[in-house]
Amino acid sequence: SCSFDAMKLLSFVPLIAPSSSADVYDSKTILSITSDDAFVDVRDVPKLLENASFASNPEVAAFLKTASIKTLKSSGLQVVSTSDDTVSSADLCSYLKNAASELPGLECECSPNFATKEQTTDDDLGVNDPQAWRQRAFERMNMKEVWRLSAPYATRTVGVAVMDSGLDFSDPEIAPYRGFFRKRSGGFIDGGWNFVNDSSNFTSVNQHGQRCARLIAARRNNNLDMVGMSSNVRLVSLRTHEDNGYGGWANLAEAMDMAVDIGVDIVSISLGDFMSRSNGERIFGKAFEAATDKGIIVVASAGNDNSLADTHYPSALPGVIAVASLNIQDPLQLSSFSNYGGYVDIAAYGAGVYTGSNVLSSGTSFPCPIVSGAAAILLSMGVKPKYVAGILTHNVDRFASPLKPLKKHAGALNPLKAVKMAIDYPILRSGR
């Protein structure tokens, strides 16, 4: 049967502050149609109805013949340019719901392209001498020792997609890591892609994605500003939001499709919000499942609502590493804003984290790239992708959090323990 549930805001907001409600982003429709688990093109539905001697709405049938429709190959999702001037999203979803009720075996999911809004907090600009010594989170994780131990085992460069506002590779901190990726479908991606306007102009005045990228890979030992987690990376910017922070779920689905097409190793997503489990997993889960099935490591922020993260997407999706935020203090504790619960896999520092250019940042947006960077270190050592999440979540520092519990046995990221395990157990690594 075809479901068309009303959904709360799907605000894929850069997670700096709690999100707020919004409306639909534009008039497009996101849908998935299958028959016996096989992909069905929405353009074929009128013919299927006709062949089965059922009436087909002529207005919708005519619209589908000429409509602009994007098909996301890896997930089977389609994005249809519906509009109130032609056929609306509600009309198309109603049409498909009726078709599914008439045609045995036809399954359809249909949703408007809900809006998202970025929200930011004031950053602490009280320091005018930005240097690596300000990165207390990195000091607490013993990153100097992590880099020393892991360096002799570095065997490969890791492709990391930053799904966010766009990146600016003129920034000397990330310029050396601009990636060039060949698409399996043909052609290539140089540095990134803008899914807001479907162009190769992916830079943004919005600095949210830039901060996340610096935490992953700001260049070490270049006498500039700060340092990132891993130096053996190629970055690609999958821009899903406008400069003002707005974006739609279709952008996220298209970006994940691209991540699969170019074969990245890690997707870092400092975005998300709550939605119904049925819509989260049935519709948008397909785009993410296509990536995790290929062995791509997907890391996502657990959210800033001081709430259970059970229906916070995409972090609640199966196979996605959900990351909560820790305060930089002893004893370890979750940040006051951080989401929590049995769907949270790991926590890392996310309150007052230095992200370059005299900026201290707080929110679950920032432990996410720290975990992504730790995953990149393991992959660069030749650790097999299927073991990375397990190594990270097994080698944590567990801490008491009775009021804000995590998944059983979850704890704080400890990259040093993780790297030592990868070194001590060569079977976890390939080619050694």
PLM feature segments, named:
Residues 12-15, 20-128:
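Primarily auto-inhibitory N-terminal propeptides
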Residues 34-35, 112-115, 162-166, 216-219, ...:
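Active-site-proximal beta-strand/loop segments in catalytic clefts of secreted hydrolases
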Residues 73-76, 94-159, 167, 171-173, ...:
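Protease zymogen maturation seam
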Residues 145-193, 197-249, 265, 310, ...:
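Subtilisin-like serine protease catalytic core
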Residues 164, 296, 312-383, 412:
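Extracellular S/T/G-rich loop segment that most often corresponds to the catalytic His/Ser-adjacent loop
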Residues 201-210, 303, 359-371:
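Gly/Ser-rich catalytic serine loop of serine hydrolases
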Residues 244-264, 274:
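Catalytic-core regions of hydrolytic enzymes
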Residues 260-271, 277-278, 282, 287, ...:
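C-terminal subdomain of the subtilisin-like protease fold in secreted/lumenal serine endopeptidases
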